[in-house]
Regions:
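Extended, Lys/Arg-enriched charged tracts that mediate electrostatic binding to polyanionic substrates
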Residues: 239-261, 265, 355, 367-369, ...
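Active-site and substrate-binding clefts of carbohydrate-active enzymes
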Residues: 71-238, 378-624
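Hydrophobic faces of well-ordered beta-strands that scaffold small-molecule active sites
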Residues: 74-76, 124-126, 279-282, 337, ...
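Short, solvent-exposed turn/loop segments enriched in Gly/Ser/Thr/Pro and often Arg
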Residues: 127-132, 283-286, 338-346, 488-491
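CE4/NodB-like, metal-dependent polysaccharide N-deacetylase domain
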Residues: 307-341, 433-451
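Structured, charged N-terminal subsegments at the starts of enzyme catalytic cores
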Residues: 255-286, 295-296
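Glycan-association/targeting regions that enable binding to alpha-glucans and other polysaccharides
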Residues: 1-72, 607-684
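Short, surface-exposed basic-aromatic patches at helix termini and helix-loop junctions that form
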Residues: 273, 331-332, 348-363, 466-479
């Protein structure tokens, strides 16, 4: 008995041979023989047949075939983004950024997320938005800084009373449990503030130091770290010192921050050139593409919602895509292949535009797939969800990956609550196994898409999520059932890793792609939609102001779109983030500042054109909010105040106005930074 075999490797190389089988035992008229084949590499296509011969004759089996592959490919995308926080009306670059989040997340997330992945045999994708990278450039090249950084740099002895109050009000903006309480001195300062005790000048200087130190990633707080640029970040010495800092210490700590800012793009570029990661992009200022193309295409299905005056500017959407491509090419030395549309928002028109602009793939949410086609796709079935689709296009088709919503949200919202990170990882892997792997049918390749925020989650994890991520990457790289891939790697193939190509023309088409995003607006009909950014009075007022500014720009401007301050201000105002916080479906506890910055960008359009800005831009879109909670009840509000009743659980509110009848209103779930339901509220 012998086995004749042939192996075709992923790179096309062939080898063949015949292996004699050894007799094992007889069982009545049957005999058992054993022939060892292999070893095989991932991606090998193996065919074989068995021949047996005896004095009585010969027997030949049919040819059998199999391919060596994992049970599941996993394409993982970490999305990193911040809106344009720079006030275009600021007279000086120093302090021109109204919020410090670009700088602070760079200390914890933007460099370290890529560096951490590089320590493991995993291939992942990082989405860096152009507007985020633009702001990092501002800090590094144009002398820009934020208000918090200016408060940090100012000697504690020279802080005015107003500056002291600003510092005490904002320098505890960190996760209490994971960023404040674990540091003894920072916790002392926090408790001192909660008691209302006076802060001495040394206390203020310690607070200047600790607010910043708490945002450095865990690895930087525990040891000196050499960066890919050759510089070394060393703030662990300050963590060890705990208190009694000098002003020179504070300035030295600030200098360490700029080392990390300088290393963000070089780290990603080096890892991408080494084939370890893929860097994707987003339309330039993070707009909701389908709404820029035509707001009238959005489904308005929340009770009380309505459409704003029509805003239909596909040319503006195209400009965001063009700028994203050119910005990417400048930074990374190649054209981008992949796109994460802002908020995963897509429509048939938007995807057609993405393909025409030269992108090879994009990703969105499973909820979009569920609403696509004539009757919807069964996105809950892994055989349906775990594959890329090809858009049906008259111009250039594009591959579309649909993320698994529940598995992605588990990492974003749930696993930070686990005290044991390894238990959290095992729970995730068990969910992948039972929800996906065990339910797959056939021998086709399957790819699970995971997409989530790559920065905001980690404040809710112990040690900035580092133990969780290390355990996750170790398990994914060591478990033969799984193989992590970048999106382009899955489509193009990678012979070195045994991954065969999955060309566009071989993908199943997705028919009648639905309009939607990765968010189902609270209070609307079931299913993902665009309602978070349109339909409520505040959102519609913003769209009206945006339309007026664009009309003025079209009338006055003569320069190339995107090449002058007026266009930059308009595109910044078209970003999704302002509309996210308008209305009652999401809340930041700082909506008024987002409102003011949105209007500042629109004023920047008129200022750049030499035009007077409308008086409406000096009036707040968001009414003055007054929030009632059980912890902080409110007994009196002003005539122009807007009352919001907020709780941590669902329910109904019973209320009466004056001597009127008793009425009830349901408490609606509202999201936070990452769209998970954080609390429940009703606005009266």
């Amino acid at each position: 008995v012998s086995v004749t075999w042939e192996v075709v490797a992923a790179d096309g190389a062939r080898r063949e041979g015949a292996t004699p089988a050894a007799w094992h035992h007889n069982d009545t008229v049957n005999s058992s023989w054993t022939a060892p084949l292999g070893p095989f590499a991932e991606g090998d296509e193996v065919t074989y047949s068995v021949q047996g011969a005896s004095p009585d004759g010969e027997v030949h089996t049919p040819t059998f075939a199999f391919r060596v592959k994992p049970a599941l490919y996993i394409a993982w995308l970490w999305h990193q983004h911040q809106p344009l926080y720079r006030d275009p009306g600021a007279a000086d670059a120093a302090g021109s950024y109204r919020a410090p989040w670009v700088r602070l997340h760079a200390l914890r997330d933007y460099y370290s997320m890529a560096a951490l992945a590089a320590q493991h045999d995993v291939h992942v994708t990082f989405n860096l938005t152009p507007v985020l990278l633009r702001q990092i450039d501002d800090y590094l090249l144009h002398g820009a800084s934020d208000v918090a950084l200016e408060l940090t740099r100012r000697p504690a002895e020279s802080l005015s009373r107003t500056q002291i109050e600003d510092l005490l009000s904002t320098f505890f903006d960190a996760d209490w449990h994971h960023q404040i309480f674990q540091h003894a001195r920072y916790r002392q300062l926090f408790e001192q503030r909660m008691r209302g005790d006076k802060f001495s000048r040394p206390d203020l200087r310690d607070l200047q130091m600790w607010f910043n130190l708490a945002w450095f990633g865990h690895e930087f707080r525990t040891a000196a770290v050499r960066l890919t640029t050759g510089e070394t970040v060393d703030v662990a010495r300050f963590v060890g010192q705990q208190r009694g800092f000098t002003h020179a210490d504070v300035l030295a700590m600030v200098d360490e921050q700029y080392k990390l800012l300088r290393a963000v793009v070089p780290m990603h570029r080096a890892l991408q050139e080494a084939g370890r990661i893929e860097v994707s992009t987003t339309p330039a200022f993070h707009p909701i593409l389908p709404l820029l193309i035509d707001t009238d295409r959005a489904a308005i299905d929340r009770p009380g919602a309505s459409r704003p005056p029509r805003y239909a500017h596909p040319e503006g959407a195209a400009t965001h895509l063009d700028l994203a491509r050119s910005d990417y090419a400048t930074r990374f030395g190649r054209q981008p292949r992949g796109l994460w549309p802002a908020e995963g928002a897509v429509s048939a028109d938007a995807v057609e535009m993405v393909g025409a602009d030269g992108f090879a793939w994009l990703a969105t949410d499973a909820g979009v797939l569920a609403r696509s086609g004539r009757w919807g796709y069964r996105a809950s079935e892994p055989d349906v969800l775990c594959q890329p689709y090809r858009t049906v296009s008259e111009r250039q088709a594009v591959a579309v990956f649909f993320r698994d919503t529940d598995l992605s949200d588990g990492v974003g919202f749930r696993y930070g609550q686990y005290t044991d990170p390894e238990a959290a990882v095992q729970d995730f892997l068990h969910a992948v196994e039972t929800k996906v792997v065990d339910r797959l049918n056939g021998d086709d390749d399957h790819v699970l898409t995971i997409v989530l925020d790559g920065e905001n989650a980690w404040g809710g994890y112990p040690d900035d999520g580092r133990p969780f991520l290390h355990s996750l990457y170790h398990c994914l790289s060591s478990d033969p059932r799984f193989r992590t891939v970048t999106f382009s790697e899955y489509l193009l193939g990678n012979p070195a890793r045994g991954i065969r190509p999955h060309p566009l023309d071989g993908l199943a088409p997705v028919h009648a792609l639905a309009t939607g995003s990765w968010i189902d607006e609270p209070g609307s009909d079931a299913g993902v939609d665009l309602g978070t950014w349109i339909g409520e009075p505040e959102e519609n007022a913003a769209w009206t102001l945006l339309g007026a500014a664009r009309s003025t720009l079209a009338r006055v401007a003569t320069t190339v779109p995107g090449a002058d301050p007026a266009h930059v201000s308009l595109m910044a105002a078209e970003g999704s983030d302002w509309f996210w916080w308008f209305g009652s479906d999401q809340e930041s506890r700082n909506d008024a500042s987002f409102d003011e910055l949105f209007r500042a960008h629109l004023r920047g359009v008129y200022h750049a054109l030499g035009e007077d800005s409308p008086a409406e831009l000096d009036e707040a879109i968001v009414p003055h909010p007054v929030v009632w909670t059980f912890a902080h009840p409110v007994s009196r509000i002003g005539r122009r105040d807007q009352l919001t009743v907020r709780t941590n659980c669902p329910g109904r509110l019973t209320f009466r106005v004056g001597d009127g009848p008793e009425r009830t209103a349901g408490l609606t779930a509202v999201g936070g930074v990452m769209a998970g339901a954080r609390r429940f509220q009703v606005t009266l």
